[in-house]
Amino acid sequence: MALALGSAAPTTLLSAEPTTADPVAAANALSQAFRNAAEKATASVVVVRSETKAQNVTSKGGQNRGENPFRGTPFEDFFRDGMPEGFSPRGGSPSRSGVGSGVIVDAAGIVLTNNHVVEGADEVTIELSDGREFKAVDIKTDPDSDLAVVRLANAEDLPTAALGNSDELVIGDWVLAIGNPFELETTVSAGIISAKGRELGRIRRAKFLQTDAAINPGNSGGPLVNLSGEVVGINTAIASNSGAYQGIGFAIPINQARWVSEQLIKSGSVQRGYLGVSIAQLSADMAAKLGSPGQKGVLVTEVMSDTPAAVAGVQDLDVVISFDGTPVDSPRSLQEVVERSSIGKAHDVVVLRDGKEVTVSVQVKALPEQFGMQQRGRGIAPGGEETFYTKPFGIEVRDKSSVAQDAYDGFEGVLVDRVDPDGLAAEGGLVPGVLIRKVGKTSVSSIDEFEAAIEGETPEGGIVLQIRTPRGNAVILLKKEV
């Protein structure tokens, strides 16, 4: 018996063997795309040479300038044992030179690079792909995003990069990293976008692209480009436990870099808007507890006094679901849209309060430079908790009990609330959110005990901190080398 299904259309037989294009032709087509992108982008990629004079060679942490192009990033430690000759610490030369990368974004001589490439340099020289050299006459930096713009002397009609749209990138997209790793000028490597939205310790105001395109010391500041030859990121750091490339690199999305660089070029600094709230991810349990099961949003845990949010009437336990019509579902997404909003203007913030939507008009203000950071001794953190700040070590701590920290249940200690960006703690790798359990062999469970434990300690003598992170226990030595 035969069964007929549907209409009596002619039968089409499908081959069991999949039909494919000529694999060599397909590979050649991809190779041609790489060649085209590299050819379009390389002319605008530059070598950034920074030099620090002898009297400034040693930084506060005792690290010689220039030997590590990743200095100041979360990954500088990975290169201390793996640097090539000429980059080794204590090199003994009367002055030190560093080499990084950059990309020309304005034909009149504006180069975009990383802050850590030019930070602290007495002299910066830019070398173009055609061999021409220019002196930097002005450098503007934004350490919070690790970006800098360099203005060149007597430059005109320079080759400029085409800037793409990093928001359009999709995981799996092909990209090229271009730069000067280990002083090998105009090196091109290929890879894909491995992930988006990565966050890295000390660089608080950037959300990184992750790529497996090879990035090494000297690549910092160079472009990550798509197959159209458009810059989609600024290569910044790698993750490695050996000092060598291990397939994980990070780049600042060009949309973010463009926003920062435009402000640096226009005014010399970056103004970011702020609300003045402590926020957290809204969990499913908390959403249900607040009467909004399944709701996505950002939970307001505290409203700081005398801030835009406080003036507007934002309340603790409000759930922010949109800002100026843009939905927000994570603390970082809210921070991004707020910091780029127009300062001095009113913005509609939609919150859920007692299960009902409420629209609050907030006049966003510029984020104060040291918001919440006390100068020394006891202070008050945003939200009202008492803190203790030690300037010699550059740490501000608060009691663990003052902040919900599920990762530290069962552990006593004090929470690192803030770290001076250029302080000894930052140089030692300490970051906000870490739990300090002991100073030396002395357990600390309150800011009083922490203050007593470091009494009389000096940066020159150093302190050993036993800490707890969400990944486990660690020990950090904070000591100023002299």
Model-derived segments and their meaning:
Residues 1-18, 23-27, 32-39, 52-53, ...:
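C-terminal recognition in membrane/secretory proteostasis and scaffolding
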Residues 103, 214-234, 425:
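Catalytic nucleophile loop of clan PA
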Residues 60-63, 71, 107-108, 112-146, ...:
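Catalytic-histidine neighborhood of serine endopeptidases
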Residues 58-91:
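Long amphipathic alpha-helical segments used for membrane anchoring, targeting, substrate engagement
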Residues 26-36, 88-110, 132-135, 159-162, ...:
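A conserved glycine-rich beta-strand in the N-terminal activation segment of trypsin-fold
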Residues 231-267, 272:
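C-terminal subregion of chymotrypsin/trypsin-like serine protease catalytic domains
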